[in-house]
Amino acid sequence: MKKQFYENVRENTIVLERTQNNQRTRFILARTVVFPAMFAALIHGYDVDAPAEMMLGGFLLLLFVVLVARHRKLERLRLLTKAYLAVTAGYLARFTGEWKSLPEDGAGYGKEKRPPDRDLHIFGAASLYQYLCAARTQAGRERLAAALTATPRDLARTRQRQAAVAELLVHPLLCIELEARGARLPDGHDTRALAKELAQPLSSSLKVISCIGIVFASAFALSFLWAAFAGGSWILPLFLFMFNLTVAIAFYPRTQRELAPLGRMARELRLYGRIFRTLERAPLRGEAFAAVLAPLFAPVRATTAQSRLTTLAECAAMRRNVLFFMLANGALLWDLHCMAYFSHWRVQAGTAAAGWLKVWAEVEVLLSLARVGHTRAVHTFPQFLDEAVPRLDAQEATPLVIAEETATPNDAHLAAGTLVITGSNMSGKTTYMRTLGSNTVLAYAGAPVCASSFALTPMAVYTSIQISDDLAGGISTFYAELLRIKKMMEYSKRGKPMLILIDEIFRGTNSADRIVGAREAIRRLTLPHAITIVTTHDFELCDLGREGVPVANAHFEEHYEGDKILFDFKIRTGRCRTTNAQYLLRMAGIMGD
């Protein structure tokens, strides 16, 4: 159903694009016909002194100007339509699995010192970040990366994001529009340095410059009017014109330096202005989203200030024409006025500009988190439990990075203690742990989770799942795992809630040492403030419950049909009674019948 919605949006957008292309062709044809006709009418009318032809030429000139303006507007709409198609394709990629080839995977945000980043596929190829990311700006991407944490931080902010994301889920078309407008920005756009420049205050010398510009521009205007209409001498306006032009040339290096930010982001200013207007008109009236958008309305309204700044940027850009530079500066000291007005704008709205850009960065995070609800039929907002002991309850939980139609939902009802999971190779043990861990990360970010219900006590997630040798550091797989488990034990001394996920504990050593070490590690990690999940092929660990340790057992099964091994990937209570390693060895041709 959700996929069908985005397919319909894509089809409608393709029809719109086709219509716009036809309109573009008509505009090009009309301009091609009108311009020479206008030129011919004006020239011929002037030659033969025919007022009617001159009027026709004037009408065609006006028509040509209108056609150019409409054509430019259509080109902007065509670019936005292309962005719509790209965004819609991104949503559809989440249903087909093609999202795993998207370039922005957040690999740079993953840290080796944070094992969950790799173990739970938070960053990197085929990761939570890659699936979610709707951010175009650098600030938005950094905020999203910071939100995807295995450690609960500010639950008040998490709940606020949940409420804001819930509001976005009601408006999927608005989400597409916002993403499409954001997609027009340069990839990885970073505006922090620019925001700092915009916030610089007006200097006292610029106040003097502003006064100079007003005085001498007024003097030239009055002298010109006096010479033109009162019979005065043209020497004075000519002198003032040359004087003003000389002043403008003298100030040119400083003018260039002061107006440089406008030149760098003239296009971005227009794009941000359209984004802010879309946000102001958006039907997002909830308290949480109102708090996010508040900086757009106070102390300075973003759209009003941005519109003025865009106009100023366009005025500053006109200086690049040499003829305009000479005429405008000789008559009006154009450069000085632009510089002074820009400085005044910075005083009035410069400090607020950084806040506007932060609003968009936060909206990009919310659009990213809403991706789960837009693309998964089964999803829910998690409930955070305020309980003294850790608890995690989930129904129909699936991993986000596996297609929903192929993922097998599983339940979890976990409290303080240890769950030992046994099962054959490829039966789903590791995926089950990752499902719980990754959904916990989504919960802390403020996103919906892939489950029909999900409730948990806020707890730090510690993992030991995907371990490899560190040749440069001289650390073996076994020793790397020891270091991770040591960190778990050190953190456990704080008495804070923990979710501990260990896959195939101590796999890097011989079976005798592994069993002894695993039994001791499980004893020390079975705590009243921790939920510990351990997968293993060592059935001896299933007997810890008989020794008074609060350990429960669960398992995954397989069954055989002819020469095929099949899994249902459903977790069951109790210990596993089957193995499949020898069967897999025979299937691979390594072991004979």
How would you describe each model-predicted region?
Residues 1-424, 431-460, 483-484:
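Alpha-helical coupling/stalk and coiled-coil linker elements that connect catalytic or binding modules
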Residues 68, 369, 376-593:
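ATPase nucleotide-binding head domains, primarily ABC-like/P-loop NTPase cores
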